Amino acid sequence: MTCDVMGGLYLAYDLLGGENGPLARLTKIVNYSVLLVLLFLTTMGFKFALIVGLAFGTALGLHFDRAGKGIPDTNRFLLGTAILRSVAIIAAVWIKENYILALVMGALVFVMSLVLPRLKISPATLYNTGKRPQLTWRQVVIAGIMMLVAVASGLFGASITHGDAKTISFVIKFGLTFGFAIFVTSIVSPLIEWYSDNLPPQSFGTGGVTLFIIGFVIQAIPSFATIFDMTK
């Protein structure tokens, strides 16, 4: 299903004008959402990774879209992305039945999403474009700062809720995973941005058709397995 969705998006991206078309921003959002879902999935579980990855990927895609066009982050924009991130954190932690921690972490994420950009620590400061992955000390420092902020915020929330060892372990794991995700994304994002802006739209169309075919084959595997099982 994921292959079908991304295949349809890339094909539509080609048909509707590429980087100058209406789907350019949406394509970036999908690219970063998929990347962050996969990164969070390494340690945080499927439901948590899906909720947080989609929300944070959407916010990141919007940040980079504006940065690429030279549009500054307005107060209204920062407020919108802060709400998106905080709601996602609340929902993801709420599912784990730690309700007070969910509200505290959501509030902290909301505040940090508004404060950090004022200190020049935001996804927009990581924006870059190039033909290959890039790594600079600036990326390392920003990823490290955001990881420490995430861990400290989680521990603060755990202390307020009088969390046990399991809760403390969870918030530390989230903070480390978040920092790792920011670090990896900052390395590969120049490559993603360059190809998004410079590849001919026809390449996305070809990729879209390929993903459609892959998605069809994957979904057809259970049917083929059933048919072969019946013929035995």
Task: Please annotate each region the language model reported.
Residues 231-232:
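Short, strongly hydrophobic alpha-helical membrane anchors
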